[in-house]
């Protein structure tokens, strides 16, 4: 990566904890391996429930933004599906490594968007990510991707294959619990995905997108579009 690209990446990163009352502004969506501006920006405040103050501003996506993310996921699917299970495991495990490097940031992000005490966010909510990811990796290691149909058909095999692009919509509460339970098994299975987190608690999901990027998840394999049900959720569900 060139110095110019490194500088741009740093500018796009969300910083936690905030300095005083510093406002977080993150209008971009993570599509095809990059943070891209919405096609039709529509600001949405993120409220800290503990103070009822606006702590961040994001943009609500449109049908066109959703279509762009789905197109990126469709284009990335053949190569990701053809990646060996061992290689997929290695790449996805990198998300866990990124979490440990930045887990305090994740705790502050969740505390801010949820209004949760920082100790609860740090010890319970943020820890959903490594807990679930580790258990998915353990289960993954016991999957037989190609196995015999049975004694009655010794020459016939069952092959497990990824199904395609997965649309994922998560609620506001316990955000990393919901995101990890949906995204990680999809990636391990060889599916590509588009995530729409709740517009009420999107900060931790955007930080999760940074983890995916820095872990080396290939462009288009994981995509994130913020938005409401009418603009993004319905469109994502229609694909």
Would you name each region that the model predicts?
Residues 35, 80, 172-174:
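Signature tryptophan residues that serve as conserved aromatic anchors
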Residues 109-119, 147-153:
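Short linear capping/connector segments at secondary-structure termini
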Residues 47-114:
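N-terminal alpha-helical segment of soluble enzymes
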Residues 145-239:
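Rossmann-like NAD(P) dinucleotide-binding subdomain of oxidoreductase/dehydrogenase enzymes
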Residues 71, 93-104, 118-143:
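Long amphipathic alpha-helix in the N-terminal Rossmann-like dinucleotide-binding domain
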Residues 64, 101, 105, 116, ...:
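Short alpha-helical
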């Amino acid at each position: 990566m060139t110095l110019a690209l490194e500088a741009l990446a740093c500018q796009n990163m969300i910083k936690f904890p905030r300095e005083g009352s510093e406002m977080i502004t993150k209008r971009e969506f993570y599509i095809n391996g990059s943070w891209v501006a919405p096609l039709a920006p529509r600001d949405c405040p993120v409220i800290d429930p503990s103070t009822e103050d606006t702590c961040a501003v994001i943009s609500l996506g449109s049908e066109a933004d959703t279509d762009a993310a789905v197109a990126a996921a469709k284009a990335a699917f053949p190569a990701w599906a053809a990646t060996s299970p061992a290689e997929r495991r290695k790449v996805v495990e990198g998300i866990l490594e990124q979490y440990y490097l930045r887990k305090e940031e994740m705790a502050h992000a969740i505390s801010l968007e949820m209004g949760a005490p920082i100790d609860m966010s740090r010890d319970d909510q943020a820890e959903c990510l490594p807990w679930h990811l580790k258990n998915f990796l353990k289960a993954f290691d016991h999957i037989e991707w190609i196995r015999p149909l049975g004694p009655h058909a010794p020459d016939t095999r069952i092959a497990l294959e990824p199904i395609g692009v997965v649309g994922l919509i998560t609620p506001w509460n316990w955000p990393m619990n919901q995101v990890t339970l949906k995204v990680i098994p999809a990636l391990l299975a060889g599916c590509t995905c588009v995530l729409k987190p709740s517009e009420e608690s999107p900060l931790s999901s955007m930080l999760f997108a940074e983890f995916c990027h820095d872990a080396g998840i290939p462009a288009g394999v994981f995509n994130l579009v913020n938005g409401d049900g009418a603009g993004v959720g319905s469109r994502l569900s229609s694909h």
